[in-house]
Each structure stands twice: as C-alpha cells, then as structure tokens.
C-alpha cells in the first residue's frame, strides 16, 4: 500500500468513528428526553427525594437537566422533642472564652452590619448570636446617625456563634428595634418589637413564621429583654416593659407555646423599675436580673414560676452592679428596695449559685468601660459585701456596654446541669468616639470548673474609619 492509500485509509476510519460517536450521542439524548420521562412521572424533569444522614435530616430538591443536577438543601426541624431545662445551674469557678466576633475590625473592609444589642441563645444543636441591625453596613454612608435606638430600618438577624454579623451568613429573624429569642427544643421563637413609640407592636415568630402579636398597652415604647428568653418543657417565658424610662412603668411576664401566647402576668412593682431583663432557667423556674433605669444602682430580681406566679425584689448583695453607681464602700444593699440615687443604667446580669451570686458590672463607676464579674458569698439572699472571686474580661481602658445571660442546654454539653454563660457588648463610635456611626462587637464567656486568668478581650478596632474622614 503506497503512502497516499495509507492516508486515505486512516482518514476514512477516523471519519467513520466520528460519525459513529455522533450517532451514539443522538441516540442517548433521544432516550433521555423522550423515553425516560415517560416512565411513570408524566414527563417531569424535576424530582424530590429525602435522604437521612446521621447528623440531621435534609430534604434535597433535585432538579435534573439531562446530565446536570442542581441540589437545594432545605432545613428540617432540629428535634422532635422539647428541651427540659429544669436542671440546676452548674457551679462555675470561672468563665472561659466561648467566642468573639471581631465584627468592627472585620467591618472596616468587609460587608458587616452596623449593629447594637447583640445576644446569644442556644438550641439543642447550636448557639447563635442575635443582633439588631441598623439596615446599614460599617464604613458606608448609611451608617450615619446610627446612634439612634429606634428606626424603621432596624431588624433582628442572627449568625452562628463566633461569626461576624456579615451579610453573607446572617439570617433574617424579625423587623425589630427591641427583641428576644429562644429555642424550645423544636424551633426558634423570636419576638421583634417595632413601630411608632406610642403604638409599638411585638410580633412573635415561631419557626420563622409570625404566629402572634402583642400591642403596646401603655403607649410608651413597648420593649423587651435584648437577650435570650427562657424555655422550660416547651413553654417559653419573657418580660416586657411599657412606660417611662425614668419613673414608674408597667411590666408583664409572658408565656408562649409553639409561638402562641398562652398566659401573661402583670408584675406589680411600685417604686421599682424593670427593664432589659437577663433571664435563665434554674431548677424549673426562670430567674431574671434586670435594669432599674429610674433610681436604683442595685439590680431588680424577678423569679417566675411555670404558672406565672412570681417573686420580685432587688439583688441583695451589698455591692452595686449598675452603671453609673457610687462607691462600693458607701453602698449597703437591699433585697426589696432600690438603693442609690443614680438614674439611667445599663443592661446587666447575675447568676444564682445556691445562696451566692455571680454578678457582672462595668469596671468604671461612671461610664460603660471595662468589665468584671464578681462572686459574692450569700449575695443572693443577704446584703453581703464578701467578694470571693473576681475576673476581668475587658480592662478599664476599653469600652464595654450591655451584658446578658444564657445557658448551654444539657443536649449540647451532655452534663446533668445547665452551664451558665454571659456575653459582653463592646460599643464603639458615637457618643464616645469621633465617628458618624455607632456599632458593637461582643465577647462570650461560659462557666467552667477552673479559675481563669484576668485579661482584656476588648474590641480592638482602630478608629476612625474612612467614612468618618469624608
């Protein structure tokens, strides 16, 4: 065979293979489009399957175009039973760092929300950080004027604990300028307060769906805890205030089951003032340490039973824990009455440990700077000044802010008690710093069986930002 014949033969074979390959593809496409859809599904190219994994159950919506699958993951309920939460608090010798979001540092160059009032709450499988956004991002023109508490742009959103409040991982929860949230073991319940000052409305969401509402009953800035509500055996409790911030107001405790309000109680507290309660479950009851924005530099204490009966008074300890406050040496303490004559205040917390109490407070007596937590012997039941432990979380050279409580459920820890935890907000920007905005980050600590060294886990952002220099 001469060279020309070889070339012709090789070319003919190659062309034949190409034609055969094309014919096979045509047959494959014809079978896929015309034959397979007719096999019991009326020509539909879409299908839904359920696949069970060890860690959870996911519904996968599978859309098929010939050889391509597009899969959307749809979340299922985390559990089929309510959390008990009737255990006692674990004894804590100190508090170890759980998370720190560094949101403002990241937000100088990242897409991070302007926020205030962050708090933490836990389900049987995870803890989430909730926060009230201002409908704007750090280092953006819309951050101007965000020192304002209430606006139509504020929303409650959440991320997994430790994540910054960024636009890519945040989950919308409610329209709100005041809020609370908690998990009953099956689904998240969130309560977002929004609307005009005189006719604000609290919208209850359960599993992401609006299920009930509470209208303002006193017409004066209906508001709630700015920290976790408390669920016990499927029933969730929270506290609301309606009325003046600097004199007698009205207070109510609410109970809901699966997002529907099933009870409420008026809290009679003449001469006392309750706002922004920090609550946690303990031995089958809800224990709250709140803010007196009227006169007291000691904190109100509210203990709620499952039937909504309650005991209300003040934290007995002979050390004040609100800000501003006077000298420790000049404070005597009271279990029943407000002490001191310092108006205003800041959200705070405390934990009962038998008759003792862990109480958090700013280190500064006059401003929201620094943060420490003290353990006072018999401070829950007596006017004791006996400080038996102290731990510094933020030093007094750095700004702090609100603080609040939550617990780790036994489903998370596998212990037979509820781990006490707290968070500290670190406010940056206005009114203390020369910026056009106000925002915050947070540090979260949880109780452990060991003493923890003092340190300062402060915010650390370098201000001003570029937007502040324009």
UniProtKB/Swiss-Prot annotation:
Gene3D superfamilies: 2.120.10.10
Region (Hypervariable stalk region): 32-86
HAMAP family: INFV_NRAM
Main localisation: virion
Transmembrane segments: 15-35
Cystine connections: 90-417, 122-127, 182-229, 231-236, 277-290, 279-288, 316-335, 421-446
Binding-site residues for substrate, renumbered to this chain: 116, 150, 275-276, 291, 368
Catalytic residues in the record: 149, 402
Residue ranges that the UniProt entry lists as topological domain Intravirion: 1-14
Family per record: Belongs to the glycosyl hydrolase 34 family.
Reaction it catalyzes: Hydrolysis of alpha-(2->3)-, alpha-(2->6)-, alpha-(2->8)- glycosidic linkages of terminal sialic acid residues in oligosaccharides, glycoproteins, glycolipids, colominic acid and synthetic substrates
Function according to Swiss-Prot or TrEMBL: Catalyzes the removal of terminal sialic acid residues from viral and cellular glycoconjugates. Cleaves off the terminal sialic acids on the glycosylated HA during virus budding to facilitate virus release. Additionally helps virus spread through the circulation by further removing sialic acids from the cell surface. These cleavages prevent self-aggregation and ensure the efficient spread of the progeny virus from cell to cell. Otherwise, infection would be limited to one round of replication.
UniProt subcellular location: Virion membrane; Host apical cell membrane
GO annotation, biological process: carbohydrate metabolic process; viral budding from plasma membrane
Name this polypeptide is given: Neuraminidase
Cofactors named for this entry: Ca(2+)
Residues carrying a glycan: 42, 46, 54, 84, 144, 293, 398
Region (Head of neuraminidase): 89-470
Gene that produces this protein: NA
Membrane topology term: Single-pass type II membrane protein
Native species: Influenza A virus (strain A/Mallard/Edmonton/220/1990 H3N8)
Note: The influenza A genome consist of 8 RNA segments. Genetic variation of hemagglutinin and/or neuraminidase genes results in the emergence of new influenza strains. The mechanism of variation can be the result of point mutations or the result of genetic reassortment between segments of two different strains.
Record text on activity regulation: Inhibited by the neuraminidase inhibitors zanamivir (Relenza) and oseltamivir (Tamiflu). These drugs interfere with the release of progeny virus from infected cells and are effective against all influenza strains. Resistance to neuraminidase inhibitors is quite rare.
PTM per Swiss-Prot/TrEMBL: N-glycosylated.
Residue sites binding Ca(2+) per the record: 292, 296, 322
Record topology, Virion surface segments: 36-470
Uppermost EC category: hydrolase
């Amino acid at each position: 065979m001469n060279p020309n014949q070889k070339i012709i033969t090789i070319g003919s074979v190659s062309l034949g293979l190409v034609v055969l390959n094309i014919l096979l593809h045509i047959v494959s496409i014809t079978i896929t489009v015309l034959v397979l859809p007719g096999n019991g599904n009326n020509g539909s190219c879409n299908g839904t399957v359920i696949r069970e994994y060890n860690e959870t159950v996911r519904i996968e919506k599978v859309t098929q175009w010939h050889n391509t699958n597009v899969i959307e993951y749809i979340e299922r309920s985390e559990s089929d039973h309510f959390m008990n939460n009737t255990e006692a608090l674990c004894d804590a010798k100190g508090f170890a760092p759980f998370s720190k979001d560094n949101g403002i540092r990241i937000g100088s160059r990242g897409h991070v929300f302007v926020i205030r009032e962050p708090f933490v709450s836990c389900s049987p499988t995870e803890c989430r950080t909730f926060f009230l956004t201002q409908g704007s991002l750090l280092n953006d023109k819309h951050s101007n004027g965000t020192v304002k508490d209430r606006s139509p742009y504020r929303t409650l959103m959440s991320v997994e604990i430790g994540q910054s409040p960024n636009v890519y991982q945040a989950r919308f929860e409610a329209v709100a300028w005041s809020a609370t949230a908690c998990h009953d073991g099956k689904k998240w319940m969130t309560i977002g307060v929004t609307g005009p000052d005189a006719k604000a409305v609290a919208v209850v969401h359960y599993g992401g769906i609006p299920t009930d509402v509470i209208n303002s009953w006193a017409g004066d800035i209906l508001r709630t805890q700015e920290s976790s509500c408390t669920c016990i055996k499927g029933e969730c409790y929270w506290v609301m205030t309606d009325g003046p911030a600097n004199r007698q107001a009205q207070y109510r405790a609410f109970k809901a089951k699966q997002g529907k309000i099933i009870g409420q109680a008026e809290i009679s507290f003449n001469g006392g003032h309750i706002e922004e309660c920090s609550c946690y479950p303990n031995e089958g009851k809800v224990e709250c340490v709140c803010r007196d924005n009227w006169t007291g530099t000691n904190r109100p204490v509210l203990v709620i039973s499952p039937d909504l009966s309650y005991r209300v008074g003040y934290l007995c300890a002979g050390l004040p824990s609100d800000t501003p406050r006077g000298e420790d040496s000049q404070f005597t303490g009271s279990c029943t009455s407000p002490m001191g004559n310092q108006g205003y205040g800041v959200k705070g917390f405390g934990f009962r440990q038998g008759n003792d109490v862990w109480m958090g407070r700013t280190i500064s007596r006059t401003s929201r700077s620094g943060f420490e937590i003290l353990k006072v012997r018999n401070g829950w039941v007596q006017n004791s000044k006996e400080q038996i432990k102290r731990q510094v979380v933020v030093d007094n050279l750095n700004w702090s802010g609100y603080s609040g409580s939550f617990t780790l459920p036994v489903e998370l820890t596998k212990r037979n008690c509820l781990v006490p935890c707290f968070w500290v907000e670190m406010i940056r920007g206005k009114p203390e710093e020369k910026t056009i905005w106000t925002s915050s980050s947070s540090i979260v600590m949880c109780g452990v069986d060991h003493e923890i060294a003092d340190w300062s886990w402060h915010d650390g952002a370098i201000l001003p930002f570029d937007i502040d220099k324009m």
